[in-house]
Amino acid sequence: MKHASFCLSSRILLLAPCRYLGTLLLLLPYPCSTLRQFLFLLRSLFIRDVEWIPAGLSHHIPYFPLASPPLTVETLLIARLLLSIKQLSLPPAKTASLSASLDAKTKGRSLLSSCSYCYMPT
């Protein structure tokens, strides 16, 4: 069930315009800490698009975190997917830096043994 939830979240993230992500994330069955992780990753990867705190999440997240909350491997692997989507519109140096950081945090974990859609280990 957990895998299905993460796969569903990646589908929603792929299909939704940025201004609706906060509302969609609120509808997913995640604890506040996971919502914080996703919002931090979105702010990192979509810095020009997500500069606000979604109104629906203000009671969960009073302020955007200045530093990342603890990230799970699953969240980091989904971040790889988000980064691959955003690569063409990011400066090459920023893309390389984010990619290297995510690779280090996932300790080179192969995505080949993961879901082909959301990269979560199956």
From Swiss-Prot:
The protein's name in its UniProt record: Uncharacterized mitochondrial protein AtMg00680
GO cellular component: mitochondrion
Keywords: Mitochondrion
Location within or outside the cell: Mitochondrion
Chief localisation class: mitochondrion
Organism: Arabidopsis thaliana (Mouse-ear cress)
